[in-house]
Amino acid sequence: MALLPRLAAGGLLLLMALAALDGKPAPPKLLQKLMDGGQRRSEDQAAAGRIIDYEDGDEPVAVSVGDTKQAARALSPLRKPQPLCSCADMSDLECMNFCRLDVMWVNRNRKPSPIQSS
C-alpha cells in the first residue's frame, strides 16, 4: 500500500514536468533530476562504490565498482567459513531449515522428560 502513494507522486511530478515544458526540449538538469528520482547523491554515496587501496605506495589507487570483488579477493586471505549451526545430522529438519535461513541454531543435548498423565 505504501507503493501506491509513491507512484502517484511520481506520476504527478512527471505530469507537472511535461506541462511545464509544453513541447520544449527538457533542460539537462531537469532530465538528471527525473532520472535520479529528485534526489542528489552526496559525495559519501558516490564514494561508497569505490575502494581505495594504499598497498603499493603512498598514492591511493581507486578501484571501480566492477572490480570490487576482484580487489576484495586479492586483499583478503583465504579462510574457511565458520559454520553457523551445530546440526547433529542432516535428518534434523528444523535445524537445517534455520541454517538455510542464516539463523544461528544451537542444539542442546537435553534428555526428553517422560509425559506424565494424571
Swiss-Prot record:
One of its GO terms (cellular component) is extracellular region. It is found in: Secreted. It comes from the Eukaryota. Residues 24-84, 112-118 form a propeptide. The keyword Transcription regulation does not apply. The record marks W105 as: Endothelin-receptor binding site. Different length molecules ranging from 17 (85-101) to 30 amino acids (85-114) have been found in the venom. Disulfide bonds join C85-C99, C87-C95. Expressed by the venom gland. One of its GO terms (molecular function) is toxin activity. InterPro entries: Endothelin_toxin_CS, Endothln-like_toxin. Keywords: Cardiotoxin, Cleavage on pair of basic residues, Disulfide bond, G-protein coupled receptor impairing toxin, Secreted, Signal, Toxin, Vasoactive, Vasoconstrictor. Its main location: secreted. Residues 1-23 form the signal peptide. GO terms for biological process: regulation of vasoconstriction; vasoconstriction. Vasoconstrictor activity. These toxins cause cardiac arrest probably as a result of coronary vasospasm. Acts by displaying agonistic activities towards endothelin-1 and -2 receptors (EDNRA and EDNRB). Belongs to the endothelin/sarafotoxin family. This is Sarafotoxin-i2. It comes from Atractaspis irregularis (Variable burrowing asp). The lineage of its organism: Eukaryota, Metazoa, Chordata, Craniata, Vertebrata.
